[in-house]
């Protein structure tokens, strides 16, 4: 029979009832719909571990970065400080799974066995039994990743090199995510905590490896990660920071929180790949060039894109998808061909035009309906320069990418032209329309 580590802080650090917990996680993760869509996702995260009412929003900001990781990340290596039981080294549990109100997460026993020859890795179920630093991360991970296996290590006294050695052995590829759980300074007055934490945030971003436990309670695992980041020249990006005085606590004695992400591959690099896919698809048909294969797990997930062709800076074709219904690489290739050869506004692209053409690929977030009471309310909610809009009414639909704001910066004029594009009368009541918005990540290439 499988042995399970039961949830120890459900109902205290986070809701113990599954539906309430799922709703709270969804609220945190959906708190910032202004974030652009993501192609890349982090190799590692640094997240806080207080009760959700205190640090949940800061933790969620890190987990939002995993939007593109679902179905790719299959293993999470989770390290945090051992608060309850003294540990020499890094303590692995002997159980088969960790349980939360959202279900159980199986441990990667093979990965844990791969550490058996390292003297700094020990077995200790007591170190995990009541430990909250790892447990509070699991509901977020279960929500954003779905199925994954877990390598949990409660870290006690250990050197930087000892922690880094464990992380390097477990590093893996895109299937492996590293998560370090740590808070910042503890129990200073608000202003003093902000001063201390500001210095600590700068040191983390600079990949310092000599943080102490007055700066971060999880300094030991964090120093190990930062040593790996320094060795691999991976930048450390600050996502969010605050303290308990900013959330649910008083200001006399506060605890600091932060979240960071470490990316091995940037969105810019992923964008270069999408541009290359679009160009290769067009050149295969236009110039008879050999087909090019692009293999990467993230290209296999569903994605929605628009491909735009510009000739000497003027529109030459633009076709896209508003919903993610096919693999990302296929979506880009098909939309590139449609923009070049099937946009009804333009003749088919000719080979002689190709040298004057620039290719843009826009990667879309999932459209979200805007709930509004009247035109004034709608205008207040629209983010000029950022939102792409979809307008639907009377069986007609049209969209403008955010790029259109460059030529039509006025919100009323933008909506008026969108009505015209949909074939609707200029005096159509906006209250009778369904309007959704999305964000894009736009990439340019010759």
Regions found by a protein language model. Give the residues of each.
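Active-site histidine-anchored catalytic micro-motif
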Residues: 2-248, 261, 271, 289
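A generic secondary-structure signal marking the coil-to-beta-strand transition
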Residues: 17, 41-45, 75, 256, ...
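Active-site lining segments that contact anionic ligands and/or coordinate catalytic metals
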Residues: 175, 233, 252-259, 356-358, ...
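Short glycine/threonine-rich loop-to-helix capping motif typified by GTGT followed
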Residues: 191-194, 251, 366-370
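Short proline/glycine-enriched turn/loop segments at secondary-structure junctions
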Residues: 244-253, 349, 426-428
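Short, basic/aromatic-enriched C-terminal tail that caps enzymatic domains
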Residues: 246-266, 438-446
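Basic nucleic-acid-binding interfaces
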Residues: 266-446
């Amino acid at each position: 029979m499988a042995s399970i580590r039961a949830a120890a802080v459900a109902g205290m650090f986070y809701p113990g009832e599954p539906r309430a917990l799922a709703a709270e996680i969804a609220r945190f993760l959906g708190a910032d719909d202004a974030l652009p869509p993501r192609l890349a996702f982090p190799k590692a995260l640094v997240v806080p571990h207080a009760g959700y009412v205190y640090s949940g929003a800061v933790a969620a900001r890190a987990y939002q970065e995993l939007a593109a990781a679902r179905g790719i990340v299959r293993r999470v290596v989770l390290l945090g400080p051992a608060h309850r039981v003294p540990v020499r080294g890094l303590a692995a549990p002997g159980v088969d799974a960790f349980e939360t109100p959202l279900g159980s997460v199986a441990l990667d026993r093979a990965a844990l066995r791969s550490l058996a020859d390292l003297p700094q890795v020990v077995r200790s179920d007591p170190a995990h039994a009541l430990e909250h630093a790892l447990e509070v991360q699991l509901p977020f991970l279960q929500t954003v990743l779905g199925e994954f296996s877990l390598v949990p290590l409660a870290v006690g006294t250990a050197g930087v090199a000892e922690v880094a050695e464990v992380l390097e052995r477990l590093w893996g590829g895109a299937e492996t995510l590293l998560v370090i759980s740590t808070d910042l300074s503890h129990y200073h007055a608000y202003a003093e905590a902000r001063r201390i934490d500001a210095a600590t945030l700068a040191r983390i971003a600079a990949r310092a490896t000599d943080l102490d436990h007055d700066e971060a309670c999880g300094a030991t695992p964090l120093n190990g990660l930062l040593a790996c980041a320094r060795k691999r020249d991976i930048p450390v990006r600050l996502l969010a920071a605050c303290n308990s005085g900013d959330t649910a606590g008083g200001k006399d004695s506060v605890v600091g929180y932060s979240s960071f992400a470490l990316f091995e591959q940037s969105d810019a690099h992923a964008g270069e790949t999408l541009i290359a896919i679009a160009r290769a698809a067009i050149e295969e048909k236009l110039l008879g060039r050999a087909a090019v294969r692009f293999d990467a797990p993230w290209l296999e997930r569903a994605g929605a894109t628009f491909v735009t062709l510009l000739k000497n800076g003027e529109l030459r074709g633009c076709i896209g998808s508003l919903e993610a219904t096919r693999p990302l690489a296929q979506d880009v290739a098909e939309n590139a061909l449609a923009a070049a050869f099937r946009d009804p506004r333009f003749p088919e692209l000719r080979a002689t035009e190709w040298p004057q053409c620039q290719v843009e690929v826009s990667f879309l977030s999932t459209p979200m309906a805007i709930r509004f009471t009247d035109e004034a309310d709608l205008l207040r909610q629209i983010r000029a320069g950022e939102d792409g809009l979809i307008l639907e009414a009377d069986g007609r639909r049209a969209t403008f990418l955010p790029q259109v704001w460059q030529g039509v910066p006025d919100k009323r004029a933008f909506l008026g032209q969108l009505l015209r594009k949909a074939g609707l009368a200029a005096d159509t009541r906006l209250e009778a329309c369904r309007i959704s918005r999305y964000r894009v990540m736009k990439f340019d290439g010759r």
